[in-house]
Amino acid sequence: MQNITDSWFVQGMIKATSDAWLKGWDERNGGNLTLRLDETDIAPFAANFHEKPRYIALSQPMPLLTNTPFIVTGSGKFFRNVQLDPAANLGVVKIDSDGAGYHILWGLTHDAVPTSELPAHFLSHCERIKATHGKDRVIMHCHATNLIALTYVLENNTALITRKLWEGSTECLVVFPDGVGILPWMVPGTDEIGQATAQEMQKHSLVLWPFHGVFGSGPTLDETFGLIDTAEKSAEVLVKIYSMGGMKQTITREELVALGKRFGVTPLASAVALY
């Protein structure tokens, strides 16, 4: 019998959560991660499912996600412990046919529940499905240190944050040409912050929560982790630049335009036009 803990998606979640903790992005129970699956992914492991899956109602219906399975991190769970006990810290859930709730098919043992940011994740999945024609499958939230730091010292608007991150590392414009959305500070774990995040996810694969963290979206766990890692590396460079007295020279507007042309991407217009 195949064991679900050996599946590509459980092993992928173990690696992503372990790597994020080692980066220092997910202290204690900080951060959450969800991966949209297909029925064919989970079908071979039906023998591992709970005999009586628990049902949990959603705070709002998700008709776009009906009958869709996900693997998710648990509420109050530590990323550093996922590798030690995947079944206690992860769960496979499946949205019901009416989109009003979901069953926990596997994992989340001892009456654990999915991340408190599940509304933000599911709403963002809906928007990224539409924006990428189903290509994006991952939503990752973490407390990336230097990205958080920048929200204290830079004006919190999309064009400026995006432009500065592009200037912090040449690859950034290529990796996230659609820029970085940013919210006002909001109480986490609510439908309101979920809706605001999803609205930004219509236009951006990265969304900053000031003084808190970042949301990233991508087609795979590796791509999503790499997206956040790239932005965080640039933020680290910027933090060092500002601590040394600021920029004396940087990548120019003309050079950013040339970079976009070379790699066949269309940079966020408002960030290019900023100065």
Swiss-Prot record:
Known cofactor(s): Zn(2+)
Matching CDD domains: Aldolase_II
Enzyme Commission numbers on file: 4.1.2.19
Keywords: Cytoplasm, Lyase, Metal-binding, Rhamnose metabolism, Zinc
InterPro entries xref list: Aldolase_class_II_sugar_metab, Aldolase_II/adducin_N, Aldolase_II/adducin_N_sf, Rhamnulose-1-P_Aldolase
GO biological process: pentose catabolic process; rhamnose catabolic process
Top-tier EC class: lyase
Predominant location: cytoplasm
Primary role: Catalyzes the reversible cleavage of L-rhamnulose-1-phosphate to dihydroxyacetone phosphate (DHAP) and L-lactaldehyde.
UniProt protein name: Rhamnulose-1-phosphate aldolase
Organism of derivation: Salmonella paratyphi C (strain RKS4594)
Name of the gene this protein is made from: rhaD
